[in-house]
């Protein structure tokens, strides 16, 4: 609705200086949803993304909802042990990762894990810094090659699982926590009411969008309310 009512209004800002309007966020999400559907990932499957607070994270999350997928955000600090467990436990079919963050190579990590991930069919790298192997797709290529058609929107039950988040696994393997469309919407509504947020407000969100705080109040907030968001990608202490 926001993309129609206020298409050119900025929905999200990033500390890189990049911005996303409501219309541009929807356009990118629609294009990505078409490509996900073309890859054969169908409603009810799990999509995992292990991205920092970068512009690509927003259309990835929205596209997953368009396709009726279960969204599985994973914080970027997790390494092979945690990521491998989560991907298998969630039976994730499609994964979005960065190439490198602070010198760590996520493509190398998933390449070493892939033989032990029977459910994982597609890996998409955002911001690839060099040539990739044939079994890793470039996010930018998917977006460039996407048609301008409208993606088929999947109708879901509000009580269906929308997001699976995993605990840190301090005392063992990470534990899955399921949220339905209804429970996430209620959490968002409660926050907006308590904070009395309106169209003149902007929320600074330093929490990762792959954590429940950052996901709800970073990605979803502008599209369900009139409040805008500034996503902080990183900070130095």
Show where each model-derived region lies.
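Conserved S/T- and glycine-rich ATP-binding loop of Class I adenylate-forming
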Residues: 47, 64, 161, 167-170, ...
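Conserved AMP-binding/adenylation subdomain of ANL enzymes
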Residues: 185-202, 210-237
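Conserved AMP-binding A3 loop
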Residues: 19-24, 162-186
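Conserved AMP-binding/adenylate-forming core of the ANL superfamily
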Residues: 8-62, 79-84, 135-144, 155, ...
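Conserved ATP-dependent adenylate/AMP-binding module captured primarily in the ANL superfamily
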Residues: 72, 78-113, 187-204, 236-237
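ANL superfamily adenylate-forming
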Residues: 101-158
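Conserved pre-ATP/AMP-binding loop-to-beta segment of ANL
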Residues: 7-8, 125, 130, 144-166, ...
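A short helix-loop-beta submotif of the ANL/AMP-binding
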Residues: 45-46, 52-72, 76-80, 88-94, ...
